Amino acid sequence: MYLYTNGTRLFFDVVGSRLKPLETVMQPKPTLLVLHGGPGLDHSYFRPSLDPLGDDAQVLYLDLRGQGRSARHGKEYYQVGIMADDVAAFCAEVGIEKPIVLGHSFGGYVALTMAMRSPDLLGGLILVSTAPVERGYDLDALEQLAGKNLREIAARQQTGTASEEDMQRFNTEVLPLYWYQFKPEYLSGIFGKTVVNVKSIVSRALLAKLSHLLANQPVRTLSPASVNSAESENSHLP
């Protein structure tokens, strides 16, 4: 489903309804809003693990602007603060009150920015693998785990000079280190279903500057959200 808001078109999907039966009445369920990692991925890698929560919560998956199935823009619009505004406008448009926002990795920066600017909008905040410090990889430790070549790629990534080939090799060789007991199907589950669009995102310098962007983004006033009339019937939640 698509929704037009804050000057962009966002793709989202929903698992579970807002209400569940409790004896003779319908009881509201909490809303879990999931923000994927990246930049350059989409929400789909979360589906196998989080869809079962639809029995007890309404789970909303959102593709951040420029990623997955959401609309592409110029590089100047790929900023953490703007994406946080997108999420806040999305919640207002579809009528979500006090969602529990789960942000994974890069999505955690977006969720944290939203929480810092408008804490009253959130019912809860879950950060998954979102770094709390302003530094990049421990290159010495990475070299011990993955070798000198991967250390050099990580160094280029942090300065914004990594190539597409660098990123592909880094992802396939370093991501397995995140699992205690890695299985190859874990990566196929991510990259086999995810709509990857790294080139549409601002240069790799964004990866090296997340903390700087977080600290220095000015607060922006949300523009009124509008739903495209041709798709509005499919945009509202059940």
For the regions a protein language model found, what residue spans apply to each?
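Alpha/beta-hydrolase
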Residues: 155-221
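Catalytic nucleophile-loop/oxyanion-hole region of alpha/beta-hydrolase
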Residues: 71-84, 131
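Conserved hydrolase catalytic core segment
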Residues: 97-140
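Flexible "cap/lid" loop of the alpha/beta hydrolase fold
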Residues: 123-158, 194
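Conserved acidic catalytic loop of the alpha/beta-hydrolase fold
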Residues: 81-99
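Conserved HGGG/HGGXW glycine-rich cap/lid loop of the alpha/beta-hydrolase fold
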Residues: 6-76, 90
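Active-site acidic short loop of glycosyltransferases
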Residues: 7, 29, 92-98, 119, ...
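Conserved loop-alpha-helix segment in the C-terminal half of the alpha/beta-hydrolase fold
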Residues: 213-238
